[in-house]
Amino acid sequence: MAASAFLLITSFLLILMLLAKPLGNIIANLIDGDIPRWLTKIESGLWRCCGLQKPGGTVKEMNWWQYALAITIFNLTGLLLLFTLLVTQHALPLNPEHFPGLKWDLALNTAISFITNTDWQAYSGENTLSYFSQMTGLTVQNFLSAATGIAVAFALIRTFSRHGVNTAGNAWVDITRITLYLLLPLSMVIALVFVSQGVIQNFEPYQLAHTIEGQPQLIPMGPVASQEAIKLLGTNGGGFFGANSSHPFENPTAISNFIQILSIFLIPCALCFAFGQVVGDNRQGHTLLWAMSIIFVIATVGVMYAELKGNLHFSLLGANSNINMEGKENRFGILATSIYAVVTTAASCGAVNAMHDSFTALGGMIPMWLIQIGEVVFGGVGSGLYGMLLFVLLTVFIAGLMIGRAPEYLGKKIEVFEMKMVALAILVTPTLALLGTALTISTASGRAGILNPGAHGFSEVLYALSSTANNNGSAFAGLNTNNMFYNLLLAIILFLGRFGMILPVLAIAGSLAVKKRQPASNGTLPTYGPLFISLLILTIMLIGALTFIPALILGPVIEHLQIWLMAR
């Protein structure tokens, strides 16, 4: 089993790097605006019609607050349109099952969830949403929310390579190029591969079948493959079906499962290569990749070990429980399920091919912790990179205090304003998660949704609030969240968790763009190599430990100890 785990992890990382390196070159060209001439001519007319072009033919650039305003307006418009679509879906076409419109609180929760790249789902798609809502509502927002995150990363990357300017690019141009030149082509290829593996893609009404017991069963249909591709590539995670990627129509084979985890990490990994290329020092991108990969491997091994040890609940009942297969698909097994769980929570994806609620206490704690540290281990498309860069700036600042030098990164001095914004961005999601958890367990409405008692019930609440605050979207289940209290609370946390981080990141970008690049000296801290990688990992672990260890002790740690003591 150890050899199989080693082969799976190493082959996954090797193939990922081989695919991400050339894609990183393409992304670097998009960041620098290096577009083929024939596309430039087409774009020129579009930018001119939209008023985005200067008289000389160059694109008008924005300062950081204009960029932030454009991003915010764009997403609020998407929120309004998606909300309207969901509440009126009964009057719209492609609704063969005649589903009614969603209640306003569920529609608001769903709309905010999808515009924030979270895809938290308090419903099952196959018995709630029409094909039209899935395609023109959710799938479209999967593209646009992913493009938003990548655009913010583009703006931040540019400011490390520029100096003495106050612009970070043009949000409208970035979102358009990311969608048309990056997300759409890759999604089309991945969707075709999924279809070849058996993922369905049709507009047929649900099919009536009879089981071997003679009972009728309604089998849902729909355009799944087209939504599945961007769900994973854009680290969105919202499933066409309630069972998500454990459903055989979404993820039928071991090959499709492997392609899914590759798709989740592909763009976040490629962005690291692109970052190194744009700033003119590939070692900087490689440093981020090494730090991410080390944490990823440790987390994956931890989950595999916990799940291979078996479930003590079954042992207490006298059942043979050498491994914990509860809540998992036999076609994937322990190893493929474990690596999927780590990938989807390390990234802000949230797609699942098993029930995380059925993992062992420690096996479920690791994915939860990966969410809580801000999903910076590869992370979401765009958000993973700018989240990791926040920790890089914090590491540089701490190291500067230790050696008595003014902190700087890539020749830019890191001063008071940048550190205030770093602190704000890093603390906003833990604050939302912990305060939301406290509010939930201290109110009758919150406790009414908890279906499991004790430490595990607390873990389910903590996971849900951590997932929504960090824009992941996965859940432990066992929590009834489709009610007014949870829909509104989680909607607020979803929105604040997304934009409460984006705005400080763009403010940092605006501040760095103005600064001159300082030449490196003998006293400059190298931000590459084993020493800095170790410092970066320790900083991430330290922040995660100080912030969430008390809450994790109340949940999964106590649950594990209770079961262990009962089994003795």
Swiss-Prot record:
Transmembrane domains' residue ranges: 7-27, 67-87, 137-157, 180-200, 258-278, 288-308, 332-352, 361-381, 384-404, 421-441, 488-508, 535-555
Keywords from UniProt, A to Z, are:
Cell inner membrane, Cell membrane, Ion transport, Membrane, Potassium, Potassium transport, Transmembrane, Transmembrane helix, Transport
Cite the Pfam families for this sequence: KdpA
Subcellular location(s): the record lists: Cell inner membrane
* UniProt keyword annotation of Glycoprotein present: no
Q: Which NCBIfam families match?
A: kdpA (TIGR00680)
**Function, as annotated:** Part of the high-affinity ATP-driven potassium transport (or Kdp) system, which catalyzes the hydrolysis of ATP coupled with the electrogenic transport of potassium into the cytoplasm. This subunit binds the periplasmic potassium ions and delivers the ions to the membrane domain of KdpB through an intramembrane tunnel.
Homology family: Belongs to the KdpA family.
Q: Which InterPro entries match?
A: KdpA
A GO molecular-function term, please? potassium ion binding
Q: What is the lineage of its organism?
A: Bacteria, Pseudomonadati, Pseudomonadota, Gammaproteobacteria, Enterobacterales
Q: What interactions and quaternary structure are annotated?
A: The system is composed of three essential subunits: KdpA, KdpB and KdpC.
The record's principal subcellular location, in a coarse class, is membrane
How does this protein sit in the membrane? Multi-pass membrane protein
Q: Which GO terms describe its cellular component?
A: plasma membrane
Annotated protein name in UniProt: Potassium-transporting ATPase potassium-binding subunit
